[in-house]
Every structure is written in C-alpha cells, then in structure tokens.
C-alpha cells in the first residue's frame, strides 16, 4: 500500500 502511495506521489512531482 505505502509503496503504491509513494509511487503515485513521486509521479506527481
């Protein structure tokens, strides 16, 4: 879960 969340956040930036 955290992995996907961090990945999506990093993709935004």
UniProtKB/Swiss-Prot annotation:
Major localization class: secreted
Top-level taxonomic group: Eukaryota
Keywords from the UniProt entry: Amidation, Secreted
Phenylalanine amide sites (modified residues): 13
Tissues where the protein occurs: Expressed by the skin glands.
GO cellular component: extracellular region
Subcellular location: Secreted
Secreted recorded as keyword: yes
Family designation: Belongs to the frog skin active peptide (FSAP) family. Temporin subfamily.
Name this protein carries in UniProt: Temporin-1R
Organism: Pelophylax ridibundus
Lineage: Eukaryota, Metazoa, Chordata, Craniata, Vertebrata
């Amino acid at each position: 879960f955290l992995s996907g969340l961090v990945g999506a956040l990093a993709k935004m930036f």
